[in-house]
């Protein structure tokens, strides 16, 4: 079979921090994908290499087999209504924090939906990405989504009931790491092993506090801390700069940081992030 016959068309709506990373990671190697992107801020779509800009959101949805929704939670409902008539028979993947597959299905109908939560370390292909599937998605759909996000780092399939907790741990967790390093006396270019293990212990405890089993908590904590440190070392940015990058206004990480900067407790910060994710989901 020729490549032309096997290339999958993937449309990405939203070309911000995460949408652009997903697009570039899927396009830089020969993964047999044709990547289309759309963003309401047209200036973001200039000088694209190996990625095609769609003229509008309807064109992207109509021409894609897989649609990745890389938009903020508050923008999702409008986007879903815009693409509804184009998604029959297609796979929809959402990275919007807090919004369930049930919520998306309520607007789109009986559509195959996968929910995904990557983190900022996707920039260096070391993301810790959690995934779950909706009512109409198949195991094969989940495998395909896992394959796509494997190019961004490690993946973990979890129950949807734990996705908001994953948002608080692996999604917002890098900010806790950056804040810890930012307020430490050691050189951020030479992070001591005892500090690394201290951060892992704190994040693992926070994960268990939110209901993860011991093995999953350890997996998420170790990978999130290691990936965050790796991002810091590879980008050579200050911890404060990376913390600000991962802290979106009104998001789960901002809620966590408001608590962490006051009492320094990772468990309390993670609870605040979870509470914010649940608040975003209350429309369900």
Model-derived regions, located:
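NAD(P)-dependent Rossmann-like dehydrogenase/reductase catalytic/cofactor-binding core
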Residues: 2-7, 204-208, 212-284
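Glycine/serine-rich anion-binding loops at beta->alpha junctions
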Residues: 118-122, 167-177
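Glycine-rich Rossmann-fold phosphate-binding loop(s) that bind the pyrophosphate
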Residues: 15-16
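Hydrophobic, well-ordered beta-alpha structural blocks that scaffold small-molecule cofactor pockets
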Residues: 2-9, 20-29, 37
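Rossmann-like NAD(P)(H) cofactor-binding subdomain of soluble oxidoreductases
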Residues: 22-25, 43-49, 56-131, 135, ...
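Internal alpha-helical scaffold of NAD(P)-dependent oxidoreductase catalytic cores
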Residues: 103, 107-112, 128-166, 175-233, ...
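NAD(P)-binding Rossmann-fold cofactor-contacting core
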Residues: 30-48
């Amino acid at each position: 079979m020729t490549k032309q016959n096997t290339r999958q068309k993937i449309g990405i709506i939203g070309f911000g921090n995460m949408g652009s990373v997903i697009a570039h990671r899927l396009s830089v190697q020969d993964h047999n994908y044709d990547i289309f992107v759309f963003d309401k801020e047209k200036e973001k779509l200039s000088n694209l290499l190996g990625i095609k800009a769609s003229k509008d959101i309807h064109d992207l949805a109509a021409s894609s087999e897989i649609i990745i929704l890389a938009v903020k939670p508050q923008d999702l409902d409008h986007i879903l209504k815009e693409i509804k008539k184009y998604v029959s028979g297609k796979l929809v993947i959402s990275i919007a924090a807090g919004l369930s597959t049930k919520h998306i299905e309520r607007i789109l109908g009986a559509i195959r939906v996968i929910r995904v939560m990557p983190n900022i370390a996707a920039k260096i292909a070391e993301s810790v990405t959690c995934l779950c599937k909706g009512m109409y998605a198949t195991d094969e759909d989940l495998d395909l989504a896992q394959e796509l996000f494997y190019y961004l780092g490690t993946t973990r399939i979890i129950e949807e009931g734990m996705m908001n907790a994953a948002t608080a741990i692996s999604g917002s967790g890098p900010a806790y790491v950056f804040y810890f390093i930012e307020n430490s006396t050691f050189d951020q270019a030479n992070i001591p092993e005892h500090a690394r293990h201290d951060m892992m212990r704190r994040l693992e405890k926070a994960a268990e506090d939110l209901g993860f089993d011991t093995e999953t908590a350890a997996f998420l904590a170790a990978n999130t801390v290691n990936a965050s440190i790796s991002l810091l070392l590879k980008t050579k940015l200050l911890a404060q700069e990376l913390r600000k990058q991962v802290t979106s206004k009104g998001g789960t990480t901002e809620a966590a940081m408001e608590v962490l900067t006051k009492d320094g407790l990772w468990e309390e910060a993670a609870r605040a992030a979870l509470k914010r994710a649940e608040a975003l989901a209350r429309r369900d």
